Amino acid sequence: MGAVIDDSMPGPGADATGTGPSDARTERETRKLEKRLCRAVGKAIDDFHMIEAGDKVMVCMSGGKDSYTLLDILLKLRARAPIAFDLVAVNLDQKQPGFPAHVLPGYLASAGVPYHIETEDTYGIVKRLIPEGKTTCSLCSRLRRGILYRVASELGCTKIALGHHRDDILQTLLLNMFFGGKMKSMPPKLVSDDGQHVVIRPLAYVAEKDTARWAAQRNFPIIACNLCGSQQNLQRQQVGQMLREWEKKLPGRVENMFNALQNIVPSHLLDARLYDFKNARATGLASADGDKAFDPQELATPAEQVVQIVPTRRSS
């Protein structure tokens, strides 16, 4: 199957407000969502020094909700930023059968965004090398990454912005723990192996539900990927569903897990490359890395697990 587009949506980037009685509430919620997205993306950019004055940022566009949201919010932030930087949207047309090649150019032109469409038949390569029924995501990702690095160099881009969000980062952490035996996730900023490119993820603090809501509000012309993202029973989809179920049962758990990625205590893990366990000896001096070994851990109790025992009177 090839890529598909939801033609039921209005034009690119159009506002989803109507004329019904709930207009005011809808507009208010939209403003709140926009403010939350801008604040989260702005904080990530600032925390990790993602964008600097004079940067030319290549925004990778897949046609999905996340990349549309990324570009839209970066455009809003650029308009009010105290520094000048350029944005160029780049899409890789992988020659999937039925891919609506007109959609992104039409949207980007109407939005006044400089763009570049790179055409490479990675679809044919993947279908030729991967047996039917096997997951194509890994090879497709490697091919796409190499092409995007090349295009970034050709366009003179200093940063490459990807649309991965908070949920992607957590899913990657759990996938690596469950199936790779390592604690590794998606970094908000990294330098490519050859030292030539800087990759940034400005949506690192953004929840997937917010990109979905923003895409619906803005009526982006979404293009679905049927080569990898829509295959059923992939490990990432299963982990994503697990996270959603956890959040439903215990609201706040996913946020706590994400916060843990920014609050690492190497002395309380088992990686001797991060902490010198071999030379850990009693010195008689207090240490910030030490621990009151026999004290109970102070952990927040999930609200749904709190049981209040109320004494009842015996009937006489």
Curated annotation (Swiss-Prot):
One of its GO terms (cellular component) is cytoplasm. It comes from the Bacteria. Its main location: cytoplasm. Residues 1-31 are annotated as: Disordered. Residues 10-21 have a biased composition (Low complexity). InterPro entries: Rossmann-like_a/b/a_fold, TilS/TtcA_N, tRNA_Cyd_32_2_STrfase. Its cofactor is Mg(2+); [4Fe-4S] cluster. A motif (PP-loop motif) lies at residues 62-67. It catalyses: cytidine(32) in tRNA + S-sulfanyl-L-cysteinyl-[cysteine desulfurase] + AH2 + ATP = 2-thiocytidine(32) in tRNA + L-cysteinyl-[cysteine desulfurase] + A + AMP + diphosphate + H(+). It holds the Pfam family ATP_bind_3. [4Fe-4S] cluster binds at residues 137, 140, 228. Its EC number is 2.8.1.-. GO terms for biological process: tRNA thio-modification. Binds 1 [4Fe-4S] cluster per subunit. The cluster is chelated by three Cys residues, the fourth Fe has a free coordination site that may bind a sulfur atom transferred from the persulfide of IscS. GO terms for molecular function: 4 iron, 4 sulfur cluster binding; ATP binding; magnesium ion binding; sulfurtransferase activity; tRNA binding. It is found in: Cytoplasm. Signal peptide: none annotated. Catalyzes the ATP-dependent 2-thiolation of cytidine in position 32 of tRNA, to form 2-thiocytidine (s(2)C32). The sulfur atoms are provided by the cysteine/cysteine desulfurase (IscS) system. The thiolation reaction likely consists of two steps: a first activation step by ATP to form an adenylated intermediate of the target base of tRNA, and a second nucleophilic substitution step of the sulfur (S) atom supplied by the hydrosulfide attached to the Fe-S cluster. Homodimer. This is tRNA-cytidine(32) 2-sulfurtransferase. The gene is ttcA.
